């Protein structure tokens, strides 16, 4: 894990990092480690998106519910002698920039949020002045053709 992060950090402009791991091998745990490493590098805002809402619920439990047996962090989380909190947010405008702020959504939900702006929701403007990390599980679904799009082409 440290080798991967060291290689990643040595790039001039790291743009993407992919972990190809089998089901049940600890991808979510690796993702939690990456979030903590990126926090130390100054990143505070994360968008976690997947193709299905039940994966979101499992991930929320792993990241936010300290009473869950699958919770991935210590009960008290400290980085550089500073206590921080992992919070679910709807946008980054009012988020505490000392905490780890995560928007959990589906791919479809992210598209909808960005293209149908609502008050206190995530917008394209959030990307203009903030460092935001995009995290995805089940990445093989991200570039896949939709059924609707495939039917149109056929």
Please tell me what each predicted stretch does.
Residues 1-154:
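RecA-like P-loop NTPase motor core of helicase/translocase proteins
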């Amino acid at each position: 894990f440290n080798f991967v992060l060291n290689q990643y950090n040595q790039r001039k402009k790291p743009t993407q990092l992919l972990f190809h791991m089998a089901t049940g091998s600890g991808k979510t745990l690796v993702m939690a480690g990456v979030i903590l490493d990126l926090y130390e590098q100054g990143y505070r805002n994360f968008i976690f998106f997947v193709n299905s809402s039940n994966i979101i619920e499992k991930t929320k439990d792993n990241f936010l519910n300290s009473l869950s047996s699958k919770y991935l962090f210590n009960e008290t989380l400290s980085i550089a002698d500073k206590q921080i909190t992992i919070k679910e947010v709807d946008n980054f405008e009012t988020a505490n920039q000392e905490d780890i702020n995560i928007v959990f959504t589906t791919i479809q939900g992210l598209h909808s949020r960005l293209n149908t702006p609502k008050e206190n929701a995530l917008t394209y403007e959030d990307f203009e002045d903030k460092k935001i990390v995009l995290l995805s599980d089940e990445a093989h679904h991200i570039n896949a053709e939709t059924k609707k799009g495939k039917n149109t082409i056929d």
